Amino acid sequence: MEYQKLNNNAYNIHFIKTTKFKKIRIKINFKEKVEREKIVYRNMLSLILLESCRKYKTKRLLDIECEELYNASIGSNTTITGNYQLLSFNSVFLNEKYTEVGMNEKTFQFFLNLIFDPLIIDNGFEETSFNNAKNYLLEDIESYEDSPMRLATSNLYHEMFEGTPIEYRVCGYKEDLEKITKENLYEYYKELIKNNHIDIFVVGEFDSNEMKKIIENNFKINTIKKPATSHIINHKTFRKVTNIVKSPKNINQSILLFGFKLNNITEFERLYTLAVYNSILGGSPDSKLFREVREKNSLCYSISSTYSGINSYEIISAGINKNDYNKAVKLIKKEIKKMTLGDFTDEEIKQAQITYIASLKEIEDAPSSMISIYEAHEYLGYDLMADREKNIVKVTRADIIALSKKLKLDTIYLLEGVKENDKGN
């Protein structure tokens, strides 16, 4: 695998060359600082731009053209990564090496048509596509109430990170969606195209000079952007007393969450030590939390831990019976304390490192995952795969103990089920 980055001031090109795949994957990211009210705008564009364009005015015509391009596929999504939000468009198509000369450029041109030449009527997006996208997004926003885990996590974020990008729901908010019109969405679209930072990632087997020429001949963006600031969110305030919150909900099972802020961690801790710590605590099937809380004491239906180096937090989540709340909290705190005291084995450290390396190996089998590695390198300064393999095995017991002391318990949140009986597990 060979990586090359090209910068022409208006956008960056990232070539990830490999002979493992017959298809080429192209991903285009539009990036800007997170603004809460703009989240729904970006979600709307994610939906509407792949529904039609000036050349292909219906979804049916788009589908026919995809078939003509040897079943090329297109997709889009939005994400929030720390201080920034990304609007991403993807295209996957068969390499012209296996079809006919010129198909790489032809498919790329089709892809760009969707992004840069939308179907605009009277200074606004076409009404049917606009309404379809708005209704779909409204359903997604309203579905938060139907997903206990999503709702509980969102409520925890509100308690811990109010007023910061971490708090914001990636789907956006109903009150912001209600303000969107066909016209103001188009105005925002034009601002996005002009002002967003843009990165183009290409994965597959191709000639770099030829692909560079294809991109530069067709990608007509020339606005020079100011350098972006850091994605990473570091916390400056920490609670002296843990915040305890309970919210009733008409569900059968209660959701228990522990939220920790990370205090002044190093880059090595962010990328490596935290991964090992989390795996041992609750991030693997044989973790301490699973063994002690779930298997030995039967105090939960499920339990795990996750972390975000970008957002500098660690979260423990468990599905419990509300009657076991006090016992579960006590036992979870006990396992956290064990990590601080170094009460874990060398074998647990080694297994966490092996699991980490195995996950890196799997990345090489998926073009989308390969892109994620280089996105993290570009946006966060994270190491590439070869360096990650070398560095993960450098994590020591002392490193894990030192990191554990930087986890500051901020909030214990319970989404309390009111349908539950008192039988326990």
Task: Name these PLM-found stretches.
Residues 52-55, 96-100, 117-126:
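Short, polar/flexible loop-turn hinges at active-site or ligand-entry regions and domain interfaces
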